[in-house]
Amino acid sequence: MKKKKDEELTPWAKYQKEHNANSRSRFKRKRKATSKNPREPQASFRRNNRNKVKKSNKKGTKRIVKEQRLSRQKLGILIGSTLIVIALFFGYFYSSISRVQKFSVSGNKRVSTAKILKNVSIKKNDVILTSIFKEGKFENNLLKKNTDIKDATVSISWSGKVKIKVKENAVMGYVIRNKTYYTVKQDGSVVRKSVSQPSSDYPIFRNFQENSTLKKFLKEYAQMPNSVQNDVAEVDFSPTKNVKDRLHFFMNDGNQVYAIMSTFAKKMKYYPEISASMKERGMVDLQVGAFSRPSGWTDEAKAASESSKSAESSSKAKKQEKTTQNSESADSTSASADSTETINSASSQSKEDLESSNAESTVNTQQDID
């Protein structure tokens, strides 16, 4: 019957039947070799599988717990740091260190520091954070309100210090061209708009017909101290045959100063001391060296004084010669008088000797007669 059944099976069914039989035989051999209990391998497999599941579950839960703990820690750190940053920000914002405290101005000479600070529109105790973003605005305000400033830079540090650097092109005075007053800047540029009545705050520059001469003069003039510049009322360019770049200063205190273009800036800083030492108003010559003389002193007067001084010196020399001659004659007369006295005394002495000798002779003769 089996043969008949096998013959009736299809090839695929035969293969499956043989494969199942082989697998059963292998399983039986393995079960006999491992244990006597046929159910033990399955139980151990189940236990192992269960243990593996438990272990994997424990590891998974531990990992999940650890990840949750780390995420909570990270979240706490993030929230804490955010709160600290916010607290520091508000603490800094409302404290004095967030405010402008100090100012420093450099580069100004004619424009006062107080005027610059007023026009820059920055005040003490302004918030640094908002002021830093307005540096360009402050610079524009300063340039608009001060025409004497050519360039300006405003920098604000987080320490509360404001640094202002300016480059001046201030009005130095008025130059006369064709009997008309024009404002002249520090760089030598002349403002085209004329002025009918110049301000007394600035000096007047005369006879500067060439712009190159005017620029050269203003370059040196700007180096003088403000105190000396404020004392200048007028400057004339008055060259001579010998001195091609002579300058004639008229000062507000009544003095007049002669100087040379190349050296007047260095020498004029000593003018206050020279003026204070003068007993009366006069002339100060700074062309060669530095000396002063009274007013009304001209070259002719100087020559006359020099000739009078030479005449006085010659008369003094003549007087000295006369006195020496008189002293010599007096010495000779005294010597002759001494010699005559000695001669007279000698003659009188000889007469006395003769008389005494005559008396002795008469006495002797009388004795002989007796």
UniProtKB/Swiss-Prot annotation:
BP GO terms, sorted: FtsZ-dependent cytokinesis
Name this polypeptide is given: Cell division protein DivIB
An example Gene Ontology CC term for this record: cell division site
Domain POTRA, first and last residues per copy: 98-169
Which stretches does UniProt call biased (Low complexity)?
A: 304-314, 327-342
Q: Where is the composition biased (Polar residues)?
A: 356-370
Gene3D superfamilies found in the cross-reference section: 3.40.50.10960
Q: Does the keyword Lyase apply?
A: no
> Which InterPro entries does the annotation name?
Cell_div_FtsQ/DivIB_C, DivIB, FtsQ_DivIB, POTRA, POTRA_FtsQ_type
The protein's job, in short, is: Cell division protein that may be involved in stabilizing or promoting the assembly of the division complex.
All ranges on the Extracellular side of the membrane = 96-370
Where would you find this protein in the cell? Cell membrane
- UniProt keyword terms in alphabetical order: Cell cycle, Cell division, Cell membrane, Membrane, Transmembrane, Transmembrane helix
Question: What is the organism of origin for this protein?
Answer: Pediococcus pentosaceus (strain ATCC 25745 / CCUG 21536 / LMG 10740 / 183-1w)
Q: Which gene encodes it?
A: divIB
Bilayer-spanning residue ranges: 75-95
